[in-house]
């Protein structure tokens, strides 16, 4: 039986996952992280993108987080997300449309505020698509 660590993935709205996992993979601001049992304590900010967990039965689940924090304690890994969603519940077509709208808004550059908002929307749409793609790749 593989070693495991307890993992909780929560957003402001709800808890999305709680259980024993063999590994948690997430995108931190300093790069990608793979957290396994026995990992050193850590606190880092998360970039928008996928968070992947491999459960003790070998099954993988993929979540999208819009950012937040990842905390590693000796027996617990916690993902505190600004917003989060199971990748299987996400709509790839809607994410593609949001990406296209954001690119179009960036090309218009009507004001600095609009540009910043469009850039943030583009980053989020691309991150959502990465989460959906990871889900497809695991199947």
Curated annotation (Swiss-Prot):
Keywords: ATP synthesis, Cell inner membrane, Cell membrane, CF(1), Hydrogen ion transport, Ion transport, Membrane, Transport. It comes from the Bacteria. It is a peripheral membrane protein. The keyword DNA repair does not apply. Disulfide bonds: none annotated. GO terms for cellular component: plasma membrane; proton-transporting ATP synthase complex. InterPro entries: ATP_F1_dsu/esu_C_sf, ATP_synth_F1_dsu/esu, ATP_synth_F1_dsu/esu_N, ATP_synth_F1_esu_C, ATPsynth_dsu/esu_N. Its main location: membrane. Transmembrane segments: none annotated. Coiled coil: none annotated. It is found in: Cell inner membrane. GO terms for molecular function: ATP binding; proton-transporting ATP synthase activity, rotational mechanism. It holds the Pfam family ATP-synt_DE_N. HAMAP family: ATP_synth_epsil_bac. F-type ATPases have 2 components, CF(1) - the catalytic core - and CF(0) - the membrane proton channel. CF(1) has five subunits: alpha(3), beta(3), gamma(1), delta(1), epsilon(1). CF(0) has three main subunits: a, b and c. Produces ATP from ADP in the presence of a proton gradient across the membrane. Belongs to the ATPase epsilon chain family. This is ATP synthase epsilon chain. It comes from Alcanivorax borkumensis (strain ATCC 700651 / DSM 11573 / NCIMB 13689 / SK2).
């Amino acid at each position: 039986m593989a070693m495991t660590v307890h993992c909780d993935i929560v957003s402001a709205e709800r808890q999305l996952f709680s259980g024993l996992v063999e590994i948690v993979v997430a995108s931190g601001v300093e790069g990608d992280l793979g957290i396994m049992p026995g990992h050193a304590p850590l606190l880092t900010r998360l970039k928008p993108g996928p968070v992947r967990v491999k459960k003790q039965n070998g099954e993988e689940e993929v979540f999208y987080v819009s950012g937040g924090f990842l905390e590693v304690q000796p027996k617990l890994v916690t993902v505190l997300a600004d917003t989060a969603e199971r990748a299987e519940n996400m709509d790839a077509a809607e994410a593609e449309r949001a990406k296209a709208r954001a690119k179009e808004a960036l090309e218009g550059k009507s004001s600095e505020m609009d540009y910043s908002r469009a850039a943030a929307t583009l980053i989020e749409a691309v991150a959502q698509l990465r989460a959906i793609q990871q889900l497809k790749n695991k199947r």
